[in-house]
Structure formats: C-alpha cells, structure tokens
Amino acid sequence: MVGQRVRTRFAPSPTGYLHVGGLRTALYNFLFAKKMKGDFIIRIEDTDQSRKVEGAQQNLIKTLEWAGIIADESPQHGGSCGPYIQSERLDIYAKHCKQLLEDHHAYYCFATPEELEENRQLQLKQGLQPKYNRKWLPEEMGGTMPESLIRQKLEAGEPYVIRMKVPDYISVWFEDIIRGPIEFDSATIDDQVLMKSDGFPTYHFASVIDDHLMEISHIIRGEEWLSSMPKHLLLYEFFGWEAPKVAHLPLLLNPDRSKLSKRQGDVAVEDYIRKGYSSEAIVNFVALLGWNEGEGCEQEVYSLQELTDKFSLERVGKAGSIFTLDKLKWLEKQYIKNRSVEKLLSVVKPLLLEELEKKPSIMAREQITSDSYLSSVIELMRERVGFEHEFVTFSTYFYFEPESYDEESVKKRWQPNTNELLADFIPQLEALSDFTAENIEAALKAFVEPKGMKNAVLIHPLRIVTSGVGFGPSLYHMLEVLGKETVLRRIRKGLECITMPA
C-alpha cells in the first residue's frame, strides 16, 4: 500500500434519511481524502432489499451535496470502478463466492430459521455467546456433514446460504489509526453468512470485495463496526489481498451519555435543514464531534476549506462525543453574524416574497422587498436572530402591521398619561425632515427632559405601538428603518387600540 493514492468511501444503505452520524462519517472520509489529495467515493449498499426505501438514494446524495460533500465517483458521477450500487454488482459477488467455495474457505448451509433460533436459545441457556454450530460444515473441511447430502440438497433446489469458515485457534490482529492495536480470538468469531438465500451478498462480504476492487486505501467508519473487522480481515486473507487501513470513529452520545437515537430527539440531517440550520453550521458542528485541532487551539468556527486543511485522523478521539444542541445553535448564530449581507439577502428575500404571497401587507411592496430596506433589517437584526428565516418570521413588524399588542408589555409599560405623551410626541416626529436614529433620539430627549421624565417613559410605549412587542433591536434604529410614514401611522393606530390597563 506504500505510495497508493488515498481513496476513501462513504457507503450508506438507502433505507431512509441521512443520520447525523452518517454525515460525520461521510465528512471525515471526504476531509481525509481531500487533505491527502485523494478521491472520495460514494457507494450505495442496497443488499438488504427488504429495507430499501424508494428515493432514499437520491435524498442521501442530495443531502451530502447540500453539505458541500461532493463525490469524485458515485452512482451519479460514475467512475472507473463502477457500478457504484451493490445490487448492480451481483455477478461480481457470485464469482468471488465461488472462489471461496473452491478454496474451502466457505460452505453451503441449509439450516432453517427455526433450527438457527433453537440453537441460539440453547447456547444462551448455557451461558455461551450465540454462534452457528457448524452442523452443515462438510467433512472435507473438518465438519461432520457428508458431501453427498450437501449435493443432494443442492440438486433438489433447497434454499441455502453460504457461510465463511473461520479458522480455529488463531488471533486476528490489526492496527486502528484511532484506537491503536486491537486483537480478536477466532473463537469469538461466527461463521458469517456471505451469500443469502435470495442470491444477494451480506454487507460483510460485499463491502470487502468492493473496497478491494474500488482500491479503497482507508476505511473510516463508526465504532459499531469494530466487531466486524476480524471477519473482514479474514476475507482479505482468504483472497490474498492487502487490507485497507482502518479508523473507527467514536460513538455519538446524548447529553446523558446514552447512544444518540431518534427516541431522544432529531437525528436526521433533514430535520435540521427543515428547522433552518445552514450547511456551514451543521458541517462545522459534526466535524467537532470527535475531532479537534489540538491543545491550545481556541478556534471553533471553521469553513469547509479550513477543515480540509487542518483535519487529521490522529486528532480524532476514542471517547464518545456528546451531541449538544446548544453548540449547534451557537455556531449557527456565529455564521449569521459573519455572513455577508449579499448572501443573507439571497435567502431572506425569497422567504419574504413567499410570505407576502400568503399574507398581503399594507406597506409598499417595492419598499419592503428592496435590497436597501432588507439590508437595513439584516444589519439591525443579525445579532438577534438564530436562523436566516427569522429575519422574516421573528421580525414580522418590519413587513406587516402589528395585529395585536403584547398584553404583558402593555401592562408593564403603560401609565395613565402614556397615550397623552404619545399623542403630543407625534408633532415632534412629523417635524423631522431627516428621519434618522440620531435625530429621533434627539427629538425624544428634547421632548421628555423639560418634563423631568426619563427616556423610558416613551421608549417602551413607542416600541409596543410600532412593533406590537416589548423587545427588539435599538428602538431608534428600528424606527429609522420603518420610516416616518409607517411610524406615525402605527402610533396613531396604537392610540386607538391601547388604553390604560385596569
């Protein structure tokens, strides 16, 4: 393998959504391949036809591409090692299985599901680790089953599977890039089914053959596959192939350190996309679930290119990684704060136009959908929103008249003379020829100070009548963005609708 071009792969099953753990696996494979100037391959492992979901393959690849994880070779992009869908490679697996049968590394097994379950229960009662009892291992391979009976079953067309013959009394050893040396006793390894009765290979068999034929140099996958490694290494040995280097990633855990699962929250990448998370934040987040740049490094926000430049498998830890939603939310806010106005506009404007189709506004459409107006809203609100869609959904008063006024805020901020003060302040605003935040603030101070009042007696009521809520960005800047005509109209409407709470 010395001098071999680095080639990694992500091999999902088309059984549904892309799990965040799957995204991390794909990302680490992609980052390592790109860092080493190698190739990243996507292969679809659909050997379990009963679990196949229509459209899942396309959705998986679409989600990966949304995240910026683009394959060099895949079902969509092709390549010299295809097909890249396992169900289209059945003749390849059959050929290699025949070779193992001829070399006495595999054998036919006619055990029924009932027999297998009975044997499993018996072993459990005896306190043994369940594994196949080798009833159908032929005499010529050290078993007790006569070859004549096996031929008779085959000629009768009875259903069978093909199992690998695990050598007795040996140790299977390998070096994991993340975990170091690992050793398994062959006594703990089951005679794995290689070919199922439907003619499809199992994952274990197909993945080994495909990884070799596709010239995969490094296998980077989740810790849950660690126990399968000795079976795979034996298959490489049976074929006389050199095994790829391997790295098994740490588990993803809930905050209570239980394994991340749908029972405790969203685990599908699509769920987070629907909630409004950006690809940059999600990729950044999953990259940090197990990897860090090193001691003393305080950087937490990384672009995909920065991750590519700095990633290394040696900096991936062994311990389980805690999936903390607060960290993802924090990252999303960092990206919004630092994203260019132009990029935010490209997202916010279509969202607003869509909202205006559902709910017309009395504000001039040309004004509130203009780049200059939306840019002002974005600059004012980018520190306060958590998602791009909140520039519309969390900031509705920039586009629509308040339909109501927050009762708690009115109760807290309204005084017996509030309506009178607001009405008297209208002429001060009308007199402003240049409706800027600075001029609005100066006018308010000039209005309240002679009365011996604090600014707050007007600031809070003004916010309520112009936005409908008791919180938000700088009042003066908000009023400037809304514009003189809108502000005056909303004050007058508020005076009609709000009275001193009882």
Swiss-Prot record:
Pfam families: Anticodon_2 (PF19269), tRNA-synt_1c (PF00749). InterPro entries: aa-tRNA-synth_I_cd-bd (IPR045462), aa-tRNA-synth_I_codon-bd_sub2 (IPR020751), aa-tRNA-synth_I_CS (IPR001412), aa_tRNA-synth_I_cd-bd_sf (IPR008925), Glu-tRNA-ligase_bac/mito (IPR004527), Glu/Gln-tRNA-synth (IPR000924), Glu/Gln-tRNA-synth_Ib_cat-dom (IPR020058), GluQ/Sye (IPR049940). It catalyses: tRNA(Glu) + L-glutamate + ATP = L-glutamyl-tRNA(Glu) + AMP + diphosphate. GO terms for cellular component: cytoplasm. Signal peptide: none annotated. Belongs to the class-I aminoacyl-tRNA synthetase family. Glutamate--tRNA ligase type 1 subfamily. This is Glutamate--tRNA ligase. It is an enzyme of class 6 (ligase). HAMAP family: Glu_tRNA_synth_type1. Keywords: Aminoacyl-tRNA synthetase, ATP-binding, Cytoplasm, Ligase, Nucleotide-binding, Protein biosynthesis. The keyword Protein biosynthesis applies. A motif ('HIGH' region) lies at residues 12-22. GO terms for molecular function: ATP binding; glutamate-tRNA ligase activity; tRNA binding; zinc ion binding. Catalyzes the attachment of glutamate to tRNA(Glu) in a two-step reaction: glutamate is first activated by ATP to form Glu-AMP and then transferred to the acceptor end of tRNA(Glu). It comes from the Bacteria. A motif ('KMSKS' region) lies at residues 259-263. GO terms for biological process: glutamyl-tRNA aminoacylation. It is found in: Cytoplasm. Monomer. The keyword ATP-binding applies.
